[in-house]
């Protein structure tokens, strides 16, 4: 079960990084927009941290999307 959780965290992190770079945002820009710490964004993007629902909601709002769209990682490859 842990490996599935780790894979999901990694995929979510990859998607967040892809969305962030597509919008030409730095980690600091995203952190400020979402009201989070820049180090937290980095840890999430590297798959080192599993973001809470509240954190995902803040990130989704910063990207002007719904949480469900943010966590849809069906097209993200590791």
Report the location of each language-model feature.
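Short, charged recognition helix plus adjacent turn
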Residues: 1-7, 71-78
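DNA major-groove recognition helix of helix-turn-helix/homeodomain DNA-binding modules
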Residues: 54-69
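DNA major-groove recognition helix of helix-turn-helix
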Residues: 45, 63, 71-74
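Alpha-helical residues within the helix-turn-helix
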Residues: 21, 32, 61
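Key DNA-contact positions within bacterial/archaeal DNA-binding proteins
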Residues: 39, 49, 68
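A short, Lys/Arg-rich alpha-helix, primarily the initiator
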Residues: 1-22
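Short alpha-helical DNA-recognition segment
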Residues: 24-43
């Amino acid at each position: 079960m842990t490996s599935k959780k780790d894979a999901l965290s990694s995929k979510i992190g990859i998607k967040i990084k892809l969305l962030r770079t597509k919008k030409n945002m730095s980690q600091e820009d995203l952190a400020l927009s979402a009201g989070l710490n820049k180090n937290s964004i980095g840890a999430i993007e590297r798959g080192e941290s599993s973001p809470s629902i509240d954190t995902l909601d803040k990130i989704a709002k910063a990207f002007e999307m719904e949480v469900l769209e943010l966590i849809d990682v069906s097209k993200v490859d590791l």
